[in-house]
Design a protein with these regions (language model features):
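Switch II (G3) loop of P-loop NTPases
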Residues: 6-18, 28-85
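Conserved phosphate-handling catalytic cores of large alpha/beta enzymes
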Residues: 46-48, 57, 69, 75-83, ...
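Short, composition-biased local secondary-structure segments
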Residues: 1, 19, 101-105
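Post-Walker A helix-loop "phosphate-sensing" segment adjacent to the P-loop in P-loop NTPases
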Residues: 1-7, 140
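Structural and coupling elements of P-loop NTPases
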Residues: 21-24
Length: 206
């Protein structure tokens, strides 16, 4: 959408099918995926950066191994990656359904590696916003994006005011309106929004 040329880099060498899954995402997004079988993540990152410069990719996204519990080896691996290549931004992806484990990982991740922002996934679940508040409290870093589903289009810019509404049990009507606008013309979206606010939204509107 912004005319950039991103490249994804497969630095998760541990989880089975991680590279295959990243390649599927890359294909859907129209972005190349850099892989280097047999290499360690810091070396993969270095080679990927050189490759990106040669092929004109102006954004390089390093996909590293996920961690649901605190793992010193994997944490050190992230430190090694940041020492191997210049990193402009470090984003921690947090599962909103993971509870206290997510909070513990976020705290250790920020203390060990340093976090610039958070991506909160599975915010379409029933947890409302407890994870958002907890992660924000322990890291002091902003939540930049939220995942509301499994598709690429389900990654949205995070709006604190809308999460506050969810926590208070008011729902997130504005996000529903935005998604309706993407799928329909403006007049139809306005009518749909009006029906939502009047509690007249039915299966025909859906």
């Amino acid at each position: 959408k912004q005319g950039r040329r991103p490249m994804l880099v497969a630095c998760d060498i541990y989880r089975p099918a991680a590279i295959d899954q990243l390649q599927v995402v890359g294909k859907q997004a129209g972005a190349p995926v850099f892989t280097l079988p047999g290499a360690k993540p810091p070396e993969i990152a270095r080679k990927a950066l050189a490759h990106a410069k040669d092929y004109g990719n102006d954004i390089v996204i390093l996909d590293t191994a996920g961690r649901l519990q605190i793992d010193e080896v994997l944490m050190q691996e992230l430190v090694d990656i940041k020492e191997a290549v210049p990193v402009d931004e470090t984003l921690l992806v947090v599962d909103a359904m993971a509870g206290q484990d997510a909070v513990n990982v976020a705290k250790t991740f920020n203390e060990t590696v340093g976090v610039d922002g958070i991506i909160l996934t599975k915010t379409d679940g029933d947890t409302r916003g407890g994870a958002a508040l907890s992660v924000l409290a322990v890291t002091g870093k902003p939540i930049k994006f939220q995942g509301v589903g499994e598709k690429l289009d389900d990654l949205e810019v995070f709006h604190p005011s809308r999460m506050a509404s969810r926590i208070l049990g008011m729902g997130d009507v504005l996000s529903l309106i935005e998604r309706a606008q993407d799928a329909a013309d403006e007049k139809a979206a306005e009518e749909t929004a009006k029906r939502m606010l009047e509690n007249k939204f039915d299966m025909n509107d859906m």
